Amino acid sequence: MAKSLRFIQCGDLHLGSPFHNLSAIDERWQRIVGKAPVRAFQKIVQMAIDKRVHAVLITGDVYTSADHNLTAQLDYVRLLHKLAQNNIQVFAVLGNHDPLEAWKAKIPFPPNVHVFPTDAVERVPLVVDGEEVAAIYGQSYAKSEQRDNLAWKFNRAAGDRFSIGMLHTQVGSRDSTYAPCTLEDLKECGMDYWALGHIHKHEILCEKPYVVYAGNPQGLDCTETGPRGCYY
């Protein structure tokens, strides 16, 4: 029996993202800074291995643009395989920068990776040593604009030991094009933990239940400063 559930929440990786306002630094540093998002995800993967987590939750916007450049794809899949080699499951939702309609990647993911569908909320059991220790719920974006309140579709199943909801959303706005919802909408779903993406600043919106934005692990321009990473 698993004594405790261990997972990492991250998102908004923006692999392959071009950095802005780099013209003032030399080419060597431009190359170093350009690889920073990948290096940040590498550190998250290594932390997952070191902490022997059961799962990594990725809350959307793995990439920045619809083309998903080949280098970014290869980096991402290589690191997913590293998690697979360490028996770590990965659960992912797609966000506004990497919706299903824009996915052109042909590089297959390893079998430890589950990407949630776009047409409905799906419940997936998290099984550790043959025992269901949690249920993960999620729904991805089909298009870059998602005006529907997806939070209204989530509903905890009876008998869940621990329920986690995953969503790429803008909390606090009814007019957003990023799956707008309110904190009360999330609270009413019965989840024990909400893993949210889209906002680049890490923030815990609520503790009962936990409603958490992990933020992005690497700032993408001079306005995104301060400590960044993931939640464990």
Placement of each model-derived feature along the sequence:
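N-terminal active-site segment of His-dependent metallophosphoesterases
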Residues: 1-73
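His/Asp/Glu-rich metal-coordinating catalytic cores
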Residues: 55, 66-212, 216-229
